[in-house]
Amino acid sequence: QDSSLQSHAYQSGAISGMALLSQFVDWLSRLLSEQALPGVIATLLLALAALGMSHLFALIGSAVSDKRLSGRFIANINRLGLLVLRSVPEYIFAFVFMLLLGPSMLPAILALAIHNGALIAYLTIRHADDVTVSAHFNGRLDGYGYEVLPAIYPNMMALLFYRFEVILRETAILGMLGIATSGFYFDSIFDAI
């Protein structure tokens, strides 16, 4: 009788253990499908959109800040603007754009693109100053695109891919401002505690 009592206790423990495991698997699958997967997808989409806009901003910012293309005075003014834009944190831009545009992914994309695009353009244009151009350089956009841009573009892309990691991390953190990235779900978990 003692062995049957132990067997019954073992079976009830196994059943409750299996039920516990089943509940854990159900909870984990709900968590992954309802929060983790949508958060990761939104984070990646926002980061890739910000990366693309940062690239465009860096291309335009470096072109208008080149002394050979826009003149010394305007280039210096543009460089000062790039310096200011890269100095303002993404969170400040995101907060201001969220007040102006409402809560969506657009304020975060614009904030990340402006900050990182200005940073990359500023660093790239410093490299462009060292590029020597031929005697046939005409001082127009086509001359810039033919002689200067090919010389600075590999460095620009290296900086852009380096900053992608930062953009991805900042995208997750910007979720705490209410954008539905992975940071949003992390923040709501702490609110529930």
What function would you assign to each model-found segment?
Residues 48-59, 92-96, 152, 156-175:
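Hydrophobic alpha-helical segments of membrane proteins
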Residues 45-82:
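Transmembrane-helix boundary motif in ABC transporter permease subunits
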Residues 37-45, 78-85, 165, 187-191:
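Alpha-helical membrane-interface segments at transmembrane helix boundaries
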Residues 104-163, 170:
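Membrane-cytosol interface at the C-terminal ends of specific transmembrane alpha-helices
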Residues 99, 167-193:
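Glycine-rich helix-loop "coupling/hinge" segments at transmembrane-helix boundaries
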Residues 78-115:
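Generic hydrophobic transmembrane alpha-helix motif, especially the helices
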Residues 46, 70-72, 87-93, 105, ...:
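Transmembrane alpha-helices and adjacent helix-loop boundaries
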Residues 1-49:
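Periplasmic/extracellular loop-to-transmembrane helix junction in inner-membrane transport proteins
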